[in-house]
């Protein structure tokens, strides 16, 4: 653990030496930057969605690599969401739930991602328009954007909250979120078994979230209660930490027995697993990554007031510690069927690669791959319960998938796998992927995209395939079909 801390400090120091301000925050929009406008280059998934949706700052879903390149050069590639015609809603969401609580909004954003079908054409990711939402606080807007980013959402529209959504002829999909859907998600996510620790602040808590937490804490303190064993952790940026320190909120929380941590978040905290094996949070973003391979900790979700209640009383959800059960996960939608016809198609390469030839076994899915937390960083095995490729290694394959999803940390995970020999021999994306392309470009892994025919549908896992790059064009050919399982 201490070695990882030292390495992290080395990275922060290196950035500082470049003249970069080290805010150590995943919520840059929560310190006055929300008034910015123009072209940005942001590499935090929730911040990308918040910026594009609620401010005048325009950014693609950048990786840390491309954002750093923009900082060094002052230029960002003009593509994707920088182009007005690409900033169009592609999913219509009718909301029929009351949405009165902050956690309701977090649940809604995550729920959208679970409805996506692989047949929907979403080249820039899911970009929903919400109809029927009530007025939203800053915290509600933040919660919606953050959890929608779990599934790669770079931008959203909400009637009466954001700028008006551009009119489109038709949507790729239309879904309705009812009060019943909301109640069912709360039931699915509610704690079963003793809660070991409550974590709030993913993304890092705003001043409003800290005050809401403090209000719930104060109500228990007035009854003479205290939080045992520091069972409540609140994560914040230094900027917001200083603000709650000045207004007395910090003193109240610490007096009650809460821990307030700054410049980090629940996702990257090294938990003592001899003490903490069941977490409770108010955030679907936290739940998404805490239960993933990043942490592998059973995590439940509740409102802030219920989270605080569990922090004070560890008997509210009595019983054995729950376990993560990937076998019970709902299968993610897939449209793949076994293909037998001959197949050859032309696509594009990238300017940093001029010529290569690759032959190998294809590993194919029409479902996006989330590298951070859902591809094992040591083995390269996909570990996402319900994913069509769950349990399958990507090592030495021609990896074919639509695009990367989830965290924009993806290229660093992919680069680590390539360095250690557990990465793919070549990558084919249906849509050009800003999370995959930088790693492939820097480390010379053959990369192709933009094929005339969808390779995620037309190629089977196990097919023998050949790819050739020449003059910027890539030919993809199936040499031999796999047998159907």
Language-model region placement:
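Conserved small/polar residues in nucleotide/adenosyl-binding loops
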Residues: 1-5
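Intrinsically disordered, low-complexity segments enriched in small residues
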Residues: 14-21, 25-28, 44-233, 304-338, ...
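Glycine-rich, small/acidic residue-mixed loop/short-helix segments
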Residues: 239, 278-329, 438-440
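Intein/HINT protein-splicing elements and their conserved insertion hotspots or analogous self-processing inserts
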Residues: 316-347, 351, 469-472, 476-485
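Feature captures the catalytic cores and cofactor-binding loops of soluble hydro-lyases/lyases
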Residues: 218-293, 343-358, 362-473
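Short acidic, glycine/serine/threonine-rich loops at helix termini
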Residues: 34-44, 81-82, 139-144, 167-171, ...
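Conserved mixed alpha/beta core segments that line enzyme active sites in large multi-domain catalysts
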Residues: 9, 23-86, 91-108, 357-390, ...
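Gly/Ser/Thr-rich loops at beta-strand to alpha-helix junctions
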Residues: 28-33, 101, 134-137, 203-208, ...
């Amino acid at each position: 653990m201490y070695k990882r801390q030292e390495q992290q400090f080395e990275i922060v120091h290196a950035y500082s030496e470049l003249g970069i301000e080290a805010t150590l925050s995943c919520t840059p929009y929560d310190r006055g930057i929300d008034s910015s406008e123009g072209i940005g280059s942001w590499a935090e998934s929730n911040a990308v969605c918040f910026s594009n949706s609620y401010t005048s700052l325009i950014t693609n879903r950048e990786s840390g690599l491309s954002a750093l390149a923009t900082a060094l050069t002052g230029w960002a590639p003009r593509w994707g969401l920088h182009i007005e015609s690409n900033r169009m809603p592609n999913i219509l969401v009718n909301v029929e739930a009351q949405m009165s609580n902050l956690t309701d909004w977090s649940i809604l954003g995550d729920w959208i991602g679970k409805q996506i079908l692989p047949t929907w054409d979403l080249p820039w990711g899911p970009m929903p328009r919400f109809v029927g939402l009530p007025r939203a606080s800053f915290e509600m807007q933040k919660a919606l954007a953050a959890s929608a980013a779990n599934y790669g959402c770079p931008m959203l529209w909400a009637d009466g909250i954001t700028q008006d959504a551009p009119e489109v002829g038709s949507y790729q999909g239309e879904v309705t979120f009812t009060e019943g859907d909301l109640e069912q998600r709360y039931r699915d996510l509610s704690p079963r078994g003793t809660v070991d620790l409550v974590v709030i602040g993913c993304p890092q808590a705003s001043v409003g979230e800290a005050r809401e937490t403090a209000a719930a804490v104060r109500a228990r303190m007035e009854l003479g209660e205290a939080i045992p064993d520091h069972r409540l952790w609140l994560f914040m940026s230094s900027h917001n930490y200083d603000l709650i320190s000045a207004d007395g909120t910090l003193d109240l929380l610490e007096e009650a027995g809460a821990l307030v941590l700054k410049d980090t978040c629940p996702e990257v905290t090294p938990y003592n697993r001899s003490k903490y094996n069941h977490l409770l949070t108010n955030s679907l973003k936290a739940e998404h990554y805490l239960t993933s391979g990043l942490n592998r900790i059973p995590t439940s979700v509740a409102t802030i007031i219920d989270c605080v209640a569990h922090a004070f009383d560890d008997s509210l959800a009595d019983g054995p510690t729950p376990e993560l059960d990937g076998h019970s996960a709902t299968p993610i939608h897939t449209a793949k069927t076994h293909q037998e016809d001959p197949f050859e198609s032309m696509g594009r390469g990238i300017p940093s690669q001029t010529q290569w030839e690759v032959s190998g076994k294809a590993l194919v899915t029409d479902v996006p791959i989330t590298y951070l937390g859902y591809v094992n960083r040591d083995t390269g095995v996909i570990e996402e319960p319900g994913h069509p490729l769950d349990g399958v290694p990507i090592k030495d394959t021609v990896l074919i998938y639509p695009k990367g999803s989830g965290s924009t940390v993806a290229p660093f995970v992919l680069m680590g796998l390539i360095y250690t020999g557990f990465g793919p021999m070549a990558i084919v994306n249906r849509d050009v992927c800003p999370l995959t392309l930088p790693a492939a470009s820097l480390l010379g892994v053959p990369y192709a995209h933009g094929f005339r025919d969808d390779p995620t549908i037309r190629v089977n896992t196990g097919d023998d395939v050949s790819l050739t790059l020449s003059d910027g064009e890539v030919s993809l050919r199936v040499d031999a079909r796999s047998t159907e399982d």
